[in-house]
């Protein structure tokens, strides 16, 4: 039990954050945040305040921090332009179900919505925050601050782990009152247990399935459910398809693990599909089109909306992914028919197609050889990056971090800084393009200032490469895709960051190994030319048409009745 103490709203914010165990904060300070930042200063070693050079990096860094560690990432910005600068990172965290707490300053509480032209005023700021959070709240008095933070953390630790936001006007932060902190409850983890009748019905479907398939999404990672996923897959002898944001939820060394290319060949034959922690949507079409008309579905998700149209109707288990998978593993009998041969045939068929995408495949292989098994790859939108989502082998959860369906250019480098801040003893490598790196190259200063242990690999082709590919295929010509780049080695040197240049996969591998061995921040420029598209393999056939691979169905004979 706590007792009321006389303090400012800024002090209350800092002390409640400390009580919640939220130590690391990514922030660009400003006048509306002065009392909050000073409250943090008073707490000394209770906090680590990391200051990037642009507010965009505050939310990206908090996202990377959260996704790598599973802990809550915290970013803090001034209102108006500070918030809008952070929106790209917030929208990415929302798309990728990242547990992020956004703290935003506000103009004087008496003038909100009045349109007086106050410093950093923005019309409808609360609505803007609401568009990229699952919950948000506003404090209008200092004594509301601890309860608002407590509610935000409760929301973050229950349900789908998307961002939440709180707004605190600067007069609320600077005003003093008798304020009581709100201790977190002991032993509460917020996990939703499955209903027994839902588990029984799903287990019966799976037990009688001729060929069950598991489609695992990012909710498996969020729930730390990898072990439970493997156990159920082994009992059912069911292949596990992972999505871009869930890769690593099951090790690629596991005999039941398949990437999405092999998965599309398998799922068309499934009579029962268990969808776990996934939106199960095609990014470029209104509904998934991968299964047969007779396929039955089980949706295991903490949100009921995950089973709603346009998805096909099915049985819903509304529960935490780990608890649901554990319950199913206890309820289903062990499969009598091994299916590893079927899975291996699909994997080989997919690997053959992936190997044909060069030179990207050679670069992906070089990355995997250079990065330790438990190292992190932060993957941005480059031609090498696109192929990496299906071709880069993963052995541990959370070790591939992507922008998900938001597809945010400029995501990679600042997000990797957050990963490095969260996991200082693990290798962190970001791959980005010369286009995307331009969004945040000033954060080389942040990497140097905090000695963050990471390498940014910049693939330099002098263009917005994917835009060029799309324009050329669609129109037969290009416009607005050429870039005027700096000398990246001189740029790195100006910030006091080591650099190297490579022009081949082997050179890149050697330079990357050296950079990782040295530790600290490094920039590695890889000079490349135009590359073919890999989009036909990652599900965007409506954009990039390619002939169907042969055989068109690699497992039909193995699954014949």
Where do the model's predicted regions map?
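Phosphate/pyrophosphate-binding active-site segments
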Residues: 1-4, 143, 179-181, 293-381, ...
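Active-site-proximal loop/turn and secondary-structure-junction residues that shape catalytic pockets
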Residues: 170-172, 383, 528
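Active-site diphosphate/adenylate-binding microenvironment
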Residues: 10-14, 18-23, 31-41, 343-425
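Thiamine diphosphate
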Residues: 111, 115-120, 267, 308-310, ...
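N-terminal alpha/beta PP-like core and its mobile active-site loop of ThDP/TPP-dependent enzymes
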Residues: 2-332, 370-373, 453-456, 492, ...
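Short glycine/proline- and acidic residue-enriched helix-loop micro-motifs
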Residues: 131-138, 185, 343-357, 495
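Conserved structured core elements
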Residues: 30, 223, 264, 319-322, ...
